[in-house]
Amino acid sequence: MTQTSAFHFESLVWDWPIAIYLFLIGISAGLVTLAVLLRRFYPQAGGADSTLLRTTLIVGPGAVILGLLILVFHLTRPWTFWKLMFHYSFTSVMSMGVMLFQLYMVVLVLWLAKIFEHDLLALQQRWLPKLGIVQKVLSLLTPVHRGLETLMLVLAVLLGAYTGFLLSALKSYPFLNNPILPVLFLFSGISSGAAVALIAMAIRQRSNPHSTEAQFVHRMEIPVVWGEIFLLVAFFVGLALGDDGKVRALVAALGGGFWTWWFWLGVAGLGLIVPMLLKPWVNRSSGIPAVLAACGASLVGVLMLRFFILYAGQLTVA
């Protein structure tokens, strides 16, 4: 299979913008998951000055908005997307996803607003001094903020898994119709969130590479990566032990050709092995070059995983 035919073939329905959309949503869900867990395990490190929380403040909602814009404008009729925003169908994975996005964004904004209450009120007093409702809303959030935080964690996990459910619902593609996908995408999303957080910590001058939050992210990163490897193995073993359609899908994806090389060099090599090899360098120096190299490789690997699953998954039709 040539590079051109690898990205353009008859059974292809969803192409590269969907892969980027899945990647961005995973980063948001991963960052929020890590941020909530940091505040639960190390409350003193999860305040408004935390680099992880500040990164989540910008990238958390920003990645979702950018991902949705890519998805909307990629549709054949993007102006009809608003109908999905108000017409829900509990039998449609896409419709349920839109509902999840709406709830996720509302809770995320409220949760972050309370954490960055002092900054928000300072901005409100400077630019909108007559808008007193902001302070009233923040006061109402005080007694329910911990419960809101628990809901935020649940929604972040659901959103991270949803990207996998979206693909696994495509029953006509044996490769994609796999129950492992939601968990795999959740783990890889947390991995990408950790990479973004560590890059932000390395860039931010006030961030201590040996701080509580940096050590927390590093400790979370290791089991998540090993979990990702286990899930990839389980994913392929499940295909190998499946029916004829799943075996054909596995052979088409990993039996040689463009997507086989893409997986072994990009996903496994660059995304998993290279960051592990660079880990001692990162631990020794904790400088920007080391962190950028290791975390950049991890992020590219996660993006390449999304491309691999999406494109290789559509090579074989049941």
From Swiss-Prot:
Keyword Cell inner membrane attached: yes
Lipid bilayer topology: Multi-pass membrane protein
Keywords (A to Z) from UniProt: Cell inner membrane, Cell membrane, Membrane, Transmembrane, Transmembrane helix
Annotated transmembrane regions: 18-38, 57-73, 90-112, 150-170, 180-199, 222-242, 258-278, 288-310
Leader peptide range in chain numbering: none
Compartments reported by the entry: Cell inner membrane
GO cellular component, one term: plasma membrane
A Pfam family of this chain: NrfD
Function: Probably involved in the transfer of electrons from the quinone pool to the type-c cytochromes.
Protein name, UniProt field: Protein NrfD
UniProt gene name: nrfD
